[in-house]
């Protein structure tokens, strides 16, 4: 600042593992506060302009790549990712060795392509093969979606899911439109836009059941620190775990808790030389975000149920790969059938049909609502 003082603000970290940094607003003169506000506003303007340019470039490049492929549904059945996921590819195109999945947004002029997700086989340093999934640099991901199938005037039910492979499996199973939101955190903004566009459609979220988060945490600690992590029932200073490493003693805190109505694990880790614990919260993010989105839009949530949960499957694509597409169809049809019954009940209560007592109809509708909620 002009006074010589320093004021720190911003965000440190990547994605969800980020932390806001900002000085307290006390102890500053009116002139200093004004200078701080002006500096923050100017920095934000510069950032917003840089983001706008990146998104504009991404939109142009995405259109060029997408339009260079003659037809949709051109993804080869022998593509490594298609083979790995055991899917019938839909709603995407292939350019060379890369699968192109469109990132669309609703705009005043209709639907606009704003970016791409690319999926391709990559070679590691040791010569092994892996699958690389990336968003085209600068793509606007928040609120962006891909659609498998078509929404028409006759469409009554639309499914929503996180990933493209899951979307392909759901579409193959139910033959109804599927919206791909690309991430758990994007379910809510995408569903809000679709509900605004199609208020009369019934939306079902085919959620990822990320129930293995505690197992993954314990496996991560084991691989990094060679330590069998214990997760306690509640927080207690007497239950801090100490791990001896070549760099010194690492302090760990892990206990069960609740966040936004969902069970979670609170985890903290402090290494030699660190003044504070680095903290994070682990939970079934797929279910938590799906429920949050459903609450805002009166949608319903269904999670895959596995015969062998220990295999580590989380989504409906995993279910299809492990147990077959018929199992996926049966699980999803249970929710679809409940909606159809509810819709029939609603039509019977119309003014044109008064052959049934209104109170009986209301009881029937409430019964069907209960069926849907229990799925």
Predicted feature descriptions by range:
Residues 375:
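Conserved ATP-binding/catalytic motifs of P-loop helicase motor domains
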Residues 156, 168-368, 372:
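TOPRIM fold recognition
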Residues 1, 146, 252-254:
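Broad, structure-driven detector of short, well-ordered beta-strand segments within folded domains
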Residues 1-81, 210-212, 218, 344:
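Non-catalytic accessory segments of DNA primases and related replication-initiation nucleases
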Residues 14, 82, 101, 162, ...:
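Terminal peptide-recognition signature
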């Amino acid at each position: 600042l002009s006074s010589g003082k320093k004021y720190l603000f911003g965000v440190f970290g990547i994605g969800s593992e980020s932390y806001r940094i900002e000085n307290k607003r006390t102890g500053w003169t009116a002139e200093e506060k004004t200078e701080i506000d002006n500096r923050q506003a100017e920095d934000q303007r510069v950032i917003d302009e840089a983001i706008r340019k990146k998104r504009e470039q991404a939109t142009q490049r995405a259109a060029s790549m997408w339009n260079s492929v003659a037809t949709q549904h051109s993804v080869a059945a022998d593509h490594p990712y298609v083979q790995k996921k055991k899917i019938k590819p839909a709603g995407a195109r292939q350019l060379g060795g890369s699968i192109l999945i469109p990132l669309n947004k609703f705009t005043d002029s209709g639907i606009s392509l704003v970016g791409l997700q690319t999926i391709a086989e990559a070679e590691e340093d040791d010569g092994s093969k892996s699958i690389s999934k990336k968003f085209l640099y600068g793509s606007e991901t928040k609120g962006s979606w891909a659609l498998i199938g078509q929404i028409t005037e006759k469409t009554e039910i639309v499914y929503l899911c996180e990933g493209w492979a899951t979307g392909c499996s759901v579409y193959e199973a139910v033959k109804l439109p599927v919206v791909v939101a690309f991430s758990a955190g994007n379910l809510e903004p995408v569903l809000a836009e679709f509900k605004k566009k199609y208020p009369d459609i019934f939306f079902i979220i085919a959620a990822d059941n990320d129930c293995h988060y505690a197992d993954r945490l314990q496996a991560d600690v084991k691989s990094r620190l060679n330590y069998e992590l214990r997760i306690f029932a509640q927080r207690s200073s007497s239950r801090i775990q100490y791990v001896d490493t070549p760099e010194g003693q690492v302090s760990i805190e892990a206990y069960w808790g609740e966040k936004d109505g969902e069970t979670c694990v609170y985890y903290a880790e402090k290494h030699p030389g660190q003044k504070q614990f680095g903290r994070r919260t682990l939970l079934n993010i797929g279910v938590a975000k799906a429920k949050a989105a459903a609450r805002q839009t009166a949608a319903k949530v269904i999670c895959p149920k596995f015969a062998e949960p220990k295999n580590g499957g989380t989504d409906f694509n995993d279910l299809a790969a492990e147990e077959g597409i018929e199992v996926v169809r049966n699980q999803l049809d249970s929710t679809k059938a409940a909606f159809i019954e509810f819709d029939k009940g609603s039509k019977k209560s119309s003014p044109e049909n008064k052959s049934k007592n209104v109170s009986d109809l209301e009881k029937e509708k409430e019964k069907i609502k209960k069926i849907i909620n229990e799925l």
